[in-house]
């Protein structure tokens, strides 16, 4: 029993320690025991669940709440090495759980070091794409919800100023390389001197030529004493790449290195050999036959994605369509990825933006309409399906020229793929529908031109020429399959043969064709003139009026616009490829008939340019269109075609001279020496200035004198107006008669013939209307009060008093 209190007599309560101190002590004990368990951990031992690993309670609670319990192969082998602080090179198949393999060690290592917001940035996670960075950040939020770390997402497309305000308080950052480097260079409060961990997801993509300079600049800002982890489905082993990141004895963990296939076993892989002009027909037929599926289609360029999306959207295949590419705004990209993730049945057209790392749930089909650049890109593309041991199917479309080379590349990477054929009965052609849509929508027609150009360019820039050969592709037929009348001009293809054309003998380029060839060309011309022109031919010869007209005209070049000589002349092609200087005509050296048969210049202009109208100008106005004909009705627009007018002055004798006449050298010398003329000129100008000064002074004196006279006259008029007689009103009496005393002496003086002025005289600055208006508008003045000398009766006194009171 507790002893009683000495003063109150009540039993004393037992002494309780502060709850905070107890909690702090308990946390310290847990941390020390966790550190001891990590030190005793054998990295080679393979655990099956997260609870078997030495992890903190906060991490275990976050994993359990996110329904992560069992470990995958890459997680069971990489996490023990990572939480012990070793550098890691991790490689595993797509969909094997690589994200948790580096997020769990990041949380654990910072937790054991008791990292707080006052310690600054502790871990940096780099991702090649924005969508993958968002996905990593969402997983980090789920499993780290019970930790006290502050985590941030830094990607392009968001407000830089808002990120700068919060960046200094972050402990973990998930970012893309470009935006991260921008903050390192521009954000003053951002400090990376204490970073403990650097993680590169999809490391082979980040370390390639596209991000090489950016990653090198980021690594220069980081301390060398740090832990570095690289994860990817196709890992790099280049010594140069590892040296750039300063890795120290990294642990290379490849889970499926000894596997028979580099792709998941549950993935069914097929390829279809289809000619390039039939690819869109095959894709349309495939979508129409698999409406109850979730499909992801990969293209090589964003222009192709936009064109196919707009075209198929108008034709309504019966399944929701989405499109994703790198030129969209970030908000639209996030919205599209979330829509496709939630959808049960949908078709997404995408570039390689969605090829790496993104986890779209339950994707049934991955279609690669364009051949991937290498086997690694193929692995990442097909990795969007068959994730986490689920079933999936992938189809690769190959042109006959790409089949042999691509199959060899896939075989080297241990990728099993089988060929399938398409049933001709189920294939449907959409070329006529595309032509009809291009006829109705000029914007879609222009987009088709850009899609064609971007595809050919993507094939042209590939390094593997055994697979990608532009010259072996049927470009004319491919353009027709897009609904276009012909293949647009591809300048970089013509430039390939510039060197061979330059080295060719000169006479081969300038010698005209034989008589037989010219006869054949003449027959071809006649056939084209007599050819029936359809509505579609006229439509495609039309010029756009609303969609980038000049740029579109450069892309398109019809056969009728090309000179026949230019077709057979390779030198002309080379000159046109230069685009700066173009050869108008070519002649053989020493041609005697060089100037014959040309006729006069006016004659040529009449043949080529049409009707000429002579206006006041030197050159005639050529009327070669209705717009020029309408221009004749506007005087304002015709001014620029008229000559400039000249102004003439006439002397006393009536001879015309121009305003400015220049003397020639002889006339100037006839007047004397230059110094003498200059002295004479100065003397004349000085005399002229003196006379002008005297004249100006006289004018100033005259104005001053007139002003003084006006002021005196005004003062005189005011004084006369004030000295005039004043009328005095007589008091009211009962009798109506008037007495003689009622008139003042001044009034009686009017009998002498002088009448007082009836109204106030106007001033010098007033007009008659001003005086009348003033008299009518103002209140009439009261009569002047009577003087005491004029008060004679009691009534006069009362009237005077009343006036004074008022």
UniProtKB/Swiss-Prot annotation:
Gene3D superfamilies associated with the record: P-loop containing nucleotide triphosphate hydrolases (3.40.50.300)
Motif DEAD box location, chain numbering: 201-204
Catalytic activity: ATP + H2O = ADP + phosphate + H(+)
Keyword annotations: ATP-binding, Helicase, Hydrolase, Nucleotide-binding, Nucleus, Ribosome biogenesis, RNA-binding, rRNA processing
Annotated GO CC locations: nucleolus
Pfam family, one: CTE_SPB4
Cystine residue pairs: none
Binding site for ATP: 92-99
Job description of the protein: ATP-dependent RNA helicase required for ribosome biogenesis. Involved in the release of U14 snoRNA in pre-ribosomal complexes. Required for pre-rRNA cleavage at site A2.
Family assignment from sequence similarity: Belongs to the DEAD box helicase family. DDX10/DBP4 subfamily.
Subunit structure and binding partners: Interacts with the U3 and U14 snoRNAs. Associates with pre-ribosomal complexes.
Protein name, as recorded: ATP-dependent RNA helicase DBP4
Species annotation: Coccidioides immitis (strain RS)
Lineage: Eukaryota, Fungi, Dikarya, Ascomycota, Pezizomycotina
Gene, per the UniProt record: DBP4
């Amino acid at each position: 029993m507790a002893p009683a209190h000495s003063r109150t007599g009540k039993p004393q309560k037992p002494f309780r320690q502060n709850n905070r101190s107890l909690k702090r002590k308990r946390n310290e004990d847990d941390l020390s025991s966790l550190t001891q368990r990590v030190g005793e951990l054998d990295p080679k031992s393979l655990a099956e669940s997260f609870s078997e690993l030495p992890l903190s309670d906060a991490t275990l609670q976050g994993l359990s709440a996110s329904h992560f319990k069992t470990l995958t192969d890459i997680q069971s082998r990489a996490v023990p090495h990572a939480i012990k602080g070793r550098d890691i090179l991790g490689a595993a198949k797509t969909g094997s759980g690589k994200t948790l393999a580096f997020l769990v060690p990041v949380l654990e290592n910072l937790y054991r070091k008791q990292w707080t917001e006052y310690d600054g940035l502790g871990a940096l996670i780099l991702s090649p794409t924005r969508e993958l960075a968002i996905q990593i950040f969402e997983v980090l939020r789920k499993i780290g919800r019970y930790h006290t770390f502050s985590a941030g997402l830094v990607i392009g497309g968001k407000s830089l100023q808002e990120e700068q305000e919060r960046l200094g308080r972050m402990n973990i950052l998930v970012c893309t390389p470009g935006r991260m480097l921008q903050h390192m260079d521009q954000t003053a409060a951002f400090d990376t001197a204490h970073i403990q961990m650097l993680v590169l997801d999809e490391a082979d993509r980040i370390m390639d030529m596209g991000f090489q300079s950016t990653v090198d600049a980021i690594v220069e800002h980081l301390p060398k004493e740090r832990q570095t982890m690289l994860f990817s489905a196709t890992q790099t082993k280049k010594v140069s790449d590892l040296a750039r990141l300063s890795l120290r004895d990294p642990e290379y963990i490849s889970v499926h290195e000894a596997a028979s296939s580099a792709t998941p076993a549950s993935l069914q892989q097929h390829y279809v050999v289809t000619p390039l002009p039939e690819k869109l027909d095959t894709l349309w037929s495939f979508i129409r036959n698999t409406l109850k599926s979730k499909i992801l289609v990969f293209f090589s360029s964003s222009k192709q994605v936009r064109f196919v999306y707009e075209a198929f959207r108008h034709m309504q295949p019966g399944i929701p369509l989405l499109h994703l590419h790198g030129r969209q705004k970030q908000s639209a990209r996030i919205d599209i990825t979330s829509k496709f993730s939630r959808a049960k049945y949908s078709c997404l057209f995408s570039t390689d933006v969605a090829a790496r790392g993104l986890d779209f749930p339950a994707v049934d089909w991955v279609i690669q309409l364009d051949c991937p650049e290498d086997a690694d890109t193929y692995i990442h593309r097909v990795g969007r399906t068959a994730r986490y041991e689920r079933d999936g199917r992938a189809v690769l479309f190959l042109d006959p020229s790409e089949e042999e080379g691509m199959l060899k590349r896939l075989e080297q990477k241990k990728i099993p793929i089988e060929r399938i054929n398409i049933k001709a009965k189920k294939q449907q052609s959409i070329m006529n529908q595309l032509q009809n849509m291009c006829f109705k929508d000029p914007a879609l027609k222009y987009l088709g031109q850009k899609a064609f150009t971007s595809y050919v360019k993507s094939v042209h820039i590939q390094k593997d020429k055994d697979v990608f050969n532009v010259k072996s592709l049927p470009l004319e037929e491919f353009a027709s399959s897009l609904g276009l009348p012909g293949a647009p001009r591809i300048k970089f293809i013509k430039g390939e043969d510039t060197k061979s054309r330059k080295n060719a003998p000169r006479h081969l380029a300038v010698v005209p064709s034989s008589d037989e060839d010219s006869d054949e060309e003449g027959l071809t011309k006649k056939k084209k003139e007599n050819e029936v022109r359809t509505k579609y031919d006229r439509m495609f010869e039309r010029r756009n009026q609303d969609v980038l007209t000049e740029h579109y005209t450069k892309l398109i070049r019809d056969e009728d616009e090309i000179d026949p000589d230019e077709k057979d002349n390779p030198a002309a092609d080379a000159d046109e490829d230069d685009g700066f200087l173009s050869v108008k005509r070519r002649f053989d050296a020493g041609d005697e008939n060089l100037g014959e048969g040309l006729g006069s210049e006016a004659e040529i202009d009449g043949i080529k340019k049409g009707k000429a109208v002579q206006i006041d100008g030197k050159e005639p106005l050529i009327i070669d269109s209705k717009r020029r004909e309408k221009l004749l009705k506007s005087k304002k627009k015709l001014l620029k075609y008229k000559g400039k007018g000249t102004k003439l002055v006439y002397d006393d004798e009536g001879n015309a001279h121009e305003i400015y006449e220049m003397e020639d050298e002889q006339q100037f010398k006839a007047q004397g020496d230059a110094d003498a003329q200059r002295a004479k000129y100065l003397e004349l100008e000085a005399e002229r200035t003196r006379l002008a000064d005297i004249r100006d002074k006289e004018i100033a004196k005259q104005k001053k004198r007139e002003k003084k006279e006006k002021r005196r006259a005004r003062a005189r008029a005011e004084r006369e107006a004030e000295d005039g007689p004043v009328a005095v009103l007589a008091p009211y009496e009962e009798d109506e008669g008037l007495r003689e005393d009622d008139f003042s002496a001044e009034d009686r003086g009017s009998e002498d013939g002088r009448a007082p002025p009836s109204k106030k005289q106007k001033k010098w600055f007033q007009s008659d209307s001003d005086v009348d208006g003033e008299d009518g508008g103002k209140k009439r003045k009261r009569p002047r009060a009577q003087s005491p000398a004029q008060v004679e009766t009691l009534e006069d006194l009362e009237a005077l008093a009343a006036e004074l009171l008022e």
